[in-house]
């Protein structure tokens, strides 16, 4: 059931579906203050407005792009070699790291020297790096020194999505350019619940947010392949995709394929939650081929090292696992250090107990040893490891509610308070932190979760799994959770962990991954609109204009899933002629509201009157016709 070594080492190939450019799109790069800061975006070409709607040029729009070089036809993709390393010069020029002779963790050395793994192993020629003795290489440390790193400038450019260039192109598009730019740039002010979203994201603003702990850039020095991204409530809401094998299903090749598929559709981060065979090798293949940050839950692998017996876990085994993964390039660790012994009995009153795998592992350990976990007791030792590689904390909510019955109970909120205390300890070491959140929460309790997190965790970025707003829809939990995700994203959550239709039922496949990603892109974007994030509405405006003007191809291409939109349209109107028709199959040619609206506008223009006057005149004509016909509501045929 697991990986085929010969396939991976000798014939591993990229998923062809992941490297095709999206329709009418091309990869562009915006250069920063230096030539090696090249920020990727996706440019979507639009057709011109037809003469019947008053001819206009519609310049391309720019959207945030997470697909890395996979959708760039100019890039040579070979997953056996991995991606290029654009961050490596930035890391080296800081002169605060050293190259190690090889892996230093016991487990990493053991895997490297195991001849049985030779054909399975990713053939990495680069050696791992670590901070020089006494140095801190975290983005938070640089930010607090007043240093704007290339990573910070990169994410500032990325967050603005080339908005100014788009508006300038609109202004130059024709005689109505100024008016068109005003129209397409218009957006609702939004309600941000105290967030401080600026009109323009600058590198200095990024630096200040990271220094305060309100944002993080997950960027391990051993993951130079990534295109930096930022997580924080004053930035675009991000989404995380979970992948990973299990003891019963999936291979390394499938997991790499899921990663490239997830980032194609908009996954900002990916968590590898593998619990089956070859966890170390699976992770290496994923990291070397990932342009987005990769997270893990190290306790999963540590548990495998003790044959699944939680009570046999030790600090030494866990520490070795952290170093092993940090040297591979993992960008953020989920660590359930907030599961305290005194909180465990509180879960006895729950409907669904402890549903977090990491939380249940640590709860079992605490009960077996009747003392606080080694994660909690050695938290400052963990910080020392994190800052030597710039691994960010994702402080795990091991006591999150697994049903709406258990939402906002004393165990969940007790752990949240402890996570806030641990956050301040991490910040003392200049280590980046985000906080994980629930879970299963009914809609009316969601804002309380956000408010408590902001207060008790000192505005560290919140990262939530949904939350699911009802428990009655197995098979549709991407929807039950998407509702909660949109809400909590609006209230201030910085990153949303996707839920697929397979949640609670099985391991997701590629189709499920895409469904989860698209659902959560909708939730994140809806939250950006509600917060009033500058420029968030540009894409909506462009699609709405295309819809009104019956530019069908543009509607498909501007949307989050062009393939699905085109497929649905073509189910009933498959001919190419339908792609330029002024109606769809919902209303047909005679009842299309947008077509009728345009006819009213055309009539008004010909008569030299306003649309209101045209509608009034039309109503008067129809009233006269009604009286002349005998004032009968139902006419005899």
From Swiss-Prot:
A GO biological process held by the record: thiamine diphosphate biosynthetic process
EC number in record: 4.1.99.17
GO CC annotation: cytosol
Comment on bound cofactor: Binds 1 [4Fe-4S] cluster per subunit. The cluster is coordinated with 3 cysteines and an exchangeable S-adenosyl-L-methionine.
Pathway field: Cofactor biosynthesis; thiamine diphosphate biosynthesis
Cofactor: [4Fe-4S] cluster
Signal peptide per UniProt: none
Stored InterPro entries: ThiC, ThiC-associated_dom, ThiC/Bza_core_dom, ThiC/BzaA/B
Catalytic activity, reaction form: 5-amino-1-(5-phospho-beta-D-ribosyl)imidazole + S-adenosyl-L-methionine = 4-amino-2-methyl-5-(phosphooxymethyl)pyrimidine + CO + 5'-deoxyadenosine + formate + L-methionine + 3 H(+)
Record-listed substrate binding positions: 242, 271, 300, 336, 356-358, 397-400, 436, 463
Protein purpose: Catalyzes the synthesis of the hydroxymethylpyrimidine phosphate (HMP-P) moiety of thiamine from aminoimidazole ribotide (AIR) in a radical S-adenosyl-L-methionine (SAM)-dependent reaction.
NCBIfam families: PRK09284.1, PRK13352.1, thiC
Full protein name: Phosphomethylpyrimidine synthase
Species the sequence originates in: Janthinobacterium sp. (strain Marseille)
Gene that this sequence comes from: thiC
């Amino acid at each position: 059931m697991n990986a085929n070594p010969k396939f991976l080492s000798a014939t591993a190939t990229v998923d062809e579906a992941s490297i095709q450019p999206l329709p009418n799109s091309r990869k562009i790069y915006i250069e920063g203050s230096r030539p090696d800061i090249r920020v990727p975006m996706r440019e979507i070409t639009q057709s011109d407005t037809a003469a019947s709607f008053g001819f206009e040029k519609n310049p391309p729009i720019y959207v945030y792009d997470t697909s890395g070089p996979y959708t760039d036809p100019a890039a040579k993709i070979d997953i056996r070699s991995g991606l290029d390393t654009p961050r490596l010069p930035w890391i080296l020029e800081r002169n605060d790291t050293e190259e190690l002779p090889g892996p230093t963790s016991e487990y990493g050395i053991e895997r490297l020297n195991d001849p049985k793994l030779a054909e399975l192993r990713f053939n990495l020629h680069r050696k791992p790096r670590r901070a020089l003795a006494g140095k801190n290489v975290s983005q938070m440390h640089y930010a607090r020194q007043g240093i704007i790193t290339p990573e910070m400038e990169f994410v500032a450019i990325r967050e603005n999505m080339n908005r100014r260039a788009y508006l300038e192109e609109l202004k130059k598009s024709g005689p109505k350019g100024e008016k068109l730019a005003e129209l397409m740039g218009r957006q609702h002010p939004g309600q941000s619940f105290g967030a401080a979203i600026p009109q323009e994201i600058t590198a200095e603003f990024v630096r200040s947010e990271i220094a305060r702990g309100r944002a993080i850039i997950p960027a391990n020095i051993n993951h130079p392949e990534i295109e930096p991204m930022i997580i924080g409530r004053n930035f675009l809401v991000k989404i995380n995709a979970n992948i990973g094998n299990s003891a019963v299903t999936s291979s390394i090749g499938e997991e790499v394929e899921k990663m490239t598929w997830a980032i194609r559709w908009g996954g900002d981060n990916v968590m590898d939650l593998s619990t089956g065979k070859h966890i170390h090798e699976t992770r290496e293949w994923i990291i070397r081929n990932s342009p987005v940050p990769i997270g893990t839950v190290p306790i999963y692998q540590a548990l495998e090292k003790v044959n699944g017996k939680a009570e046999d876990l030790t600090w030494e085994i866990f520490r070795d696992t952290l170093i092993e993964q940090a040297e591979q390039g993992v960008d953020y660790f989920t660590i359930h250090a907030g599961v305290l012994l005194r909180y465990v009995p509180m879960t006895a009153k729950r409907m669904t107990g402890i549903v977090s795998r990491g939380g249940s592992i640590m709860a079992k350990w605490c009960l077996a040893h009747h003392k606080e976990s080694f994660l909690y007791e050695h938290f400052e030792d963990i910080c020392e490891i994190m800052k030597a590689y710039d691994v960010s904390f994702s402080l795990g909510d091991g006591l999150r509610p697994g049903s709406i019955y258990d939402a906002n109970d004393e165990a969940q909120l007790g752990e949240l308070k402890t996570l806030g205390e641990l956050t301040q300890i991490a910040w003392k070491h200049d280590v980046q932190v985000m906080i994980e959140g629930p879970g299963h929460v009914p809609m009316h309790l969601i804002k309380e979760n956000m408010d408590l997190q902001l207060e008790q965790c000192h505005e560290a970025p919140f990262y939530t799994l949904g939350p699911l707003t009802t428990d009655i829809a197995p098979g549709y939990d991407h929807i039950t959770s998407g509702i909660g995700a949109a809400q909590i994203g609006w209230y201030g959550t910085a990153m949303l962990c996707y839920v697929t239709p397979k949640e609670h039922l099985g391991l997701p496949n590629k189709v499920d991954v895409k469904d989860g990603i698209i659902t959560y892109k909708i939730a994140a974007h809806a939250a950006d609109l509600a917060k009033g994030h500058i420029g968030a509405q540009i894409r909506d405006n462009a699609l709405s204009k295309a819809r009104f003007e019956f530019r069908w191809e543009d509607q498909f291409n501007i949307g989050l899933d062009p393939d699905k939109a085109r497929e649905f349209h073509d189910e009933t109107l498959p001919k190419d002629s339908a792609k330029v028709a002024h109606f769809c199959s919902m209303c047909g040619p005679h009842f299309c509201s947008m077509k009728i609206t345009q006819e009213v506008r055309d009539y008004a223009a010909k008569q030299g009157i306003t649309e209101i006057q045209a509608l009034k005149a039309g109503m008067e004509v129809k009233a006269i016709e009604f009286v002349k016909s005998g004032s009968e509501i139902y006419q005899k045929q």
